[in-house]
Amino acid sequence: EREVCLPDSSLDPMFFLHGDGWLQRWQLQDLSVNHIALGLRVQHDCGFDYSALLVYRLSDEGLTAHLTLRHCGTEPMLDGVGFHPFFVKTSQTQIQFFSSGYWPEGEKHLPLSWQRNMPDDIDFSCAKVPNNVWMNHGYSGWNGVAHLVTPHQPTVTIRSSVPYLMLFQMPNEPFICLEPQSHPVDAHNMEGQ
């Protein structure tokens, strides 16, 4: 066991939950009419040493976004990745995904104990319009597919190989985030993670 001092972040001074990739200037790697590839290389004194590649591609089937993270350091490190797209949401947008349980949000936005039984208002195994309330929950046992369906709009389907999904929304806002993640929030402090 070793102690790692996380890098300072003025936007998340207590936890560094969102890392720092989203705060960096990414470099153009490749560009064409139907795709763009952006690369990032980050090294911190504490041992976080990684590269990332983000590729957006348009096709007849839709938009594909692919995010890859590679640890480049000589010592093992607790790296993880989360992809946080914001989607337009109306009062009629329905969300649907399967999961085996969830972590309710606790104090300081950290998760409480994992729960197998979900209240109906946050169980999206059947498509439904989310309540217009603050939601910030992590789901486990996600099968890697989520749908956002809004009448008279293209259906959004999210497909990912990672086992965790965050759902985030603020009341009275026209967006929702469905965030595939490689790990649960605060995983480094969870038993068995």
Q: Where is each model-derived feature located?
A:
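Extended, loop-rich substrate-binding clefts of extracytoplasmic carbohydrate-active enzymes
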Residues: 13-60
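Short solvent-exposed strand-capping/beta-turn motif centered on an Asx-Ser/Thr pair
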Residues: 70-75, 151
